[in-house]
Amino acid sequence: MPRRAQTARKEKYAPALSRTTDKIVVKLMMNGKKGLAERILRQALARAEASARRPGLEVLDAALRNATPIIEVKPRRVGGATYQVPVEIRGDRRMSLGVRWLVQAARKRTGKSMSEKLAGELVDAMNGIGAAVKRREDTHKMAEANRAFSHFKW
């Protein structure tokens, strides 16, 4: 029996954003080190807050909005040819693609620590620049270029 009183668990983030932050933590996590991934995210949000002069979660929300794709192309075989058919993305896949692209872009950056790289990518994505936003723009351009094949949707 413990002699000390049990402490209540504290919520780290607002409930609405906790799903988003949890997804980012899972994408950041390597070798099961969830505590380290959470610390990286917390530090990145603090750095982003300092550089953008806006609350960290607001920066994260804006960055995700700018990096999240709405439409993508999927290959569809018709006759002997394969066409890239533009398809609208479901909400959950949209979110996971945005998070994945942000984390991948942050990992590719050159910098000191992962929290610095992630903070830089978040601020860039919030401002509409950066690798994750560029990837979204490329995806949308590809869908726009293949709009003629949209009648092949299944």
Describe each model-derived feature in a short phrase.
Residues 1-31, 35-38, 42-154:
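Strongly charged
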